């Protein structure tokens, strides 16, 4: 589901290249289905952040965000009265009632992890899993599931490692935002690409609060970060090329 959420972020940019409204809506519907099917609520929040961020950095942002919020408020009462709608509400993050034990586990994980982190505050510990607090988190499968990437980083590498981890992505986000200013026109394709990358990165940073950095997840967020760096470099090259072109035009004899 996390990979599908990232695909949603990319689709925010790619959809403008699809001229058929039917195909555009079908693509959005397929992505929505793929996002909903695993019933993993963390990527749902991440996808929502992507959409809000993308709209918020575009034209008529305030008006469109108000319309989006109004539509969401209207949708909840409608779901409550349609057949099967209550089941959907129960699955929603923050307001749903399904998997309450999952929320309890996450709360215990935060509480116990903070105790362990305080013992090795600056540089973390390689054997944090053997501590009594972490051993008490062993689940039925015999594993300790650290379902929060930031906590996992802090446990392994301490506050210094966590600051470097967060600072890396914050620097890239600021670089993307700065690069977007090189394209002042709201309908510029390059600016829209920056909006999509910034929204996708923000969504990922929210999603990894709820998931472990296992399998392809680190590959995804490092890859998106790399795309952000490439976008910032592209904007700088274009700006230098435009500056050089302007100077050469001024130096041409009349």
Go through each PLM region and give its residues.
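Membrane-interfacial loop-to-transmembrane alpha-helix junctions, especially the N-terminal start
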Residues: 23-24, 187-197
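Transmembrane alpha-helices of multi-pass, membrane-embedded glycan-processing enzymes
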Residues: 2, 151, 155, 161-174
């Amino acid at each position: 589901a996390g990979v599908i959420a990232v695909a949603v972020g990319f689709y925010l940019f790619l959809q403008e290249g699809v001229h058929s409204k039917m195909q555009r809506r079908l693509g959005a519907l397929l992505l929505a289905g793929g996002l909903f099917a695993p019933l993993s609520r963390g990527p749902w929040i991440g996808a929502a952040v992507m959409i809000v961020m993308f709209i918020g950095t575009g034209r008529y942002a305030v008006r469109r965000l108000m319309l989006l919020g109004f539509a969401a408020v209207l949708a909840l009462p409608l779901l409550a009265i349609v057949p099967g709608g209550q089941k959907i509400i129960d699955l929603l993050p923050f307001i749903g009632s399904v998997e309450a034990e999952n929320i309890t586990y996450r709360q215990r994980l935060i509480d116990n992890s903070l105790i362990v982190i305080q013992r090795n505050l600056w540089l973390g510990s390689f054997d944090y899993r053997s501590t009594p607090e972490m051993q008490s988190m062993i689940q039925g499968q015999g594993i300790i599931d650290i379902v929060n990437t930031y906590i996992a980083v802090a446990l392994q590498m301490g506050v210094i490692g966590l600051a470097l981890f967060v600072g890396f992505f914050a620097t890239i986000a600021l670089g993307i935002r700065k690069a977007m200013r090189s394209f002042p026109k709201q309908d510029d394709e390059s600016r829209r690409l920056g909006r999509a990358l910034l929204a996708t990165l923000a969504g990922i940073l929210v999603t990894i609060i709820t998931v472990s950095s296992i399998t392809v997840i680190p590959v995804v967020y490092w890859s998106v970060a790399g795309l952000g760096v490439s976008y910032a470099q592209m904007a700088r090259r274009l700006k230098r090329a435009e500056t050089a072109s302007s100077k050469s035009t001024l130096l041409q004899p009349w």
